[in-house]
Structures are given as C-alpha cells and as structure tokens.
Amino acid sequence: MNRTYLQKYLKTNSSIQWLYMKYMQYYAKKFLNHPETWKQWQLAKLTAMLSYAQRHCTYYRKYIVGEVRMDNSMEIIKSLPLLDKNIIRHQEKNVYSDEITDNWKVWLNTGGSTGEPLHFPALYKGLPVEGVCQMMLYMKMGYQWGDIIVSFDGCRIKDEDRSRNIYWQMGNANFPFGKKNFSTLYLDNNSVKYYWEELKRTKPAFIRGYPSGIMEMCKLAMNTGIVMDLKLKGVYLTSESFTQDEKNFISSYFKCPVYGQYGHTESSIFAIQNPADEVYYCSPIYGYTEVVDQKGQHVNIGEQGEVVVTGFVEYGLPFIRYKTGDLAIYGGETELGETILTKLLGREVDCIYNKGGKKIYLVGFIFRSE
C-alpha cells in the first residue's frame, strides 16, 4: 500500500477508506497491546533500510560495506556520515533509490522553517507506519469507529465559496487528516461565527492542526461571545511550534486533553507530546532518532543538540542520519526504545505578517505533493 495509491483513492473510494482504517486499527492495537516489541521492530526496520540503501543507492554503497545484519546494524548506523539538504542536492540521483525512474510522478516538498525546502521522490514500501502511528495517537485520545476528525490548516478556499461564507473544504478522508479542512487563512471577527456554525453541524470528536490557528479561533470566539458547546475527545497540535501555556489554554477552552505531534515531510520521525508537559517521545516504530553535537557525536542527557533521524517509511530517498535543522534537549531513552526530547527548540519561523498585520502560515505554502 504505497503513497501514490493512497493519494489517488482515499478521497474517492469509500471501500479503500474503510479497508485502510481497519488495517491501521489492527496494527495500532497490535503495537499498543505489545509495546515490548517496539525495540525489536525498530532494529529489524533499521536493518532493512540500511540493507536497501546499500543495494539500491550509489551514494551509500561506498559507506555500507559487508553484510547488514540485526546484530551489526546499530554499529553501522553510528559509523555513517550525516546527511543534509546540501548533500542531497549535490548528489541527487546518487542518493535516490535506483527504483526512481526519469518520469517518476510522485514528489514531495519538505518544510522550510529551518532552511530551504527540499524536493524529493516519494516511494513507500511495506507497512504504512505513518498511518499506524497516527492511529495509535488517536486511539490514545479515545478514538472509536465513526468518530469525526476535522483539521485547521492553510488550505486555500475558492473566492466563490468565501463569498458565501464558506471557509472550509472536504478532506481526502476522515482519517488521519480530517473529514473537513478549515482554513486558518480567513479567520477574523467577522468570519469566526461561520467556522463555529459549521463545527457544530459537523460534531467532531477531534480537532487537529496548526496551534496558532486553533488558538486564534478560540480567542475570536471568546471575544465575540460564541458559546463553546462541542464535545471533543481531544485536540492534536501539529506543524508549528507552541508553548505549554498555549496548550493549556486550548485544553481549558475545549475542556479536553491536548496532545502535540512533531514530524517532517521526510517521514523519518513521529514524536508525541502528552498533555501535561513539553516532553516529546519519538516512536521507534517510525524511525531511529539521535540528538548530536556539531561533530556528529551523540550528546549526553540534558545537553542540547541537533535532531538527526533515520526513517523507516521513505525509500525513494532513504533519509539515513538526516539532519533536520531542529535543536532539542536530549532526555535519554525509554525502556520501549522511544528517544526522549525534553524540549524541542527548533521551528522558530512558522508565520509571516501581511501589510494589514494578518498572520500568514508558511506551512500551507510548503507542504504540497505533486
């Protein structure tokens, strides 16, 4: 089940949507019920990724020598050089999988909040762990079959719709990104009531999306006297930085727990922040996460370093020891294999302001597949 197939059919084929949801629920339950398997899964996937890169990427053949096995993959990964956007741009096809053809159609753009965006080919293989980790988070928040999810993001709404006070559009599928996508671009004192009217009609169990947009909607609703009568199970903040105070405010307003999620388009890290604090736990199911100093050496607990990731999702361009550009305080590792980020320090630039002082969220302009 690769990304190309899902992008094409999840929006229009209800049978595919249903099967995908059931598939994700099955594996999410399996991992949640057996967390003792996470570290072994991570080791197996790391071994598979290194072996694949050795066989299919010219760039890695000179660095990965000899047989890659589960008993030596950790030693191998620590010996490899760090990868960054400049190396990728310079190497191009050498670092791409040899399965990527000249007429490859599925390409993605990375975020540019900590640097210039990167354009790379997308190729999934095996279990879609992105969906599994998303489902694990929703189930942690109490997800049940039939619960509605809506998102707040930077989608652009047609002029015709906005003239009729419609500031949302239908999503690709309810899970994981929302049945309806509410745009953060048009929120103001005049439009907020229409957002709330549609939210009440939709009756979501979960809201996910940009923290700043969700915060702004809450504040505008309070300022205009709108009564909050949604019955939410949880709010899921992603794509932007936010503070614990902002998370607490959203939780207090919606009267539900608020979780944070940290990741990248490179599909190499999926980290969860619980409601009570700012600590992130990086899933060993999704990838292998390090925090390194300027020399590429792993920092000690309590020290600051750059988040470096090796993903288990993206094979078109294997992101192995990839420098994210984000800084974090390293907090060690849980017994389940989760890398702990005590505090995430990256992503300072999430928005700009137009001449009228209106926030324009950068993420909506960057994260777009072709």
Region spans (language model):
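Nucleotide 5′-phosphate-binding alpha/beta core
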Residues: M1-N109, E116-G131, M135-I148, C155, ...
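Short Asp/Glu-rich motifs
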Residues: E130, D161, F270
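Hydrophobic transmembrane signal anchors and adjacent membrane-proximal interface regions, especially
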Residues: G66-M70, R164-M170, L362-F367
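Active-site glycine/GP-rich loop and adjacent strand/helix microenvironment
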Residues: M1-E36, A44, S51, N174-E370
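Mobile, glycine- and charge-enriched loop segments
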Residues: F120, D147-D188
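Alpha-helix boundary/capping detector
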Residues: N86, M136-L137, E160, R164, ...
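Short secondary-structure capping/turn micro-motifs that flank functional sites
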Residues: R69-M70, G154-C155, M215, E266-S267
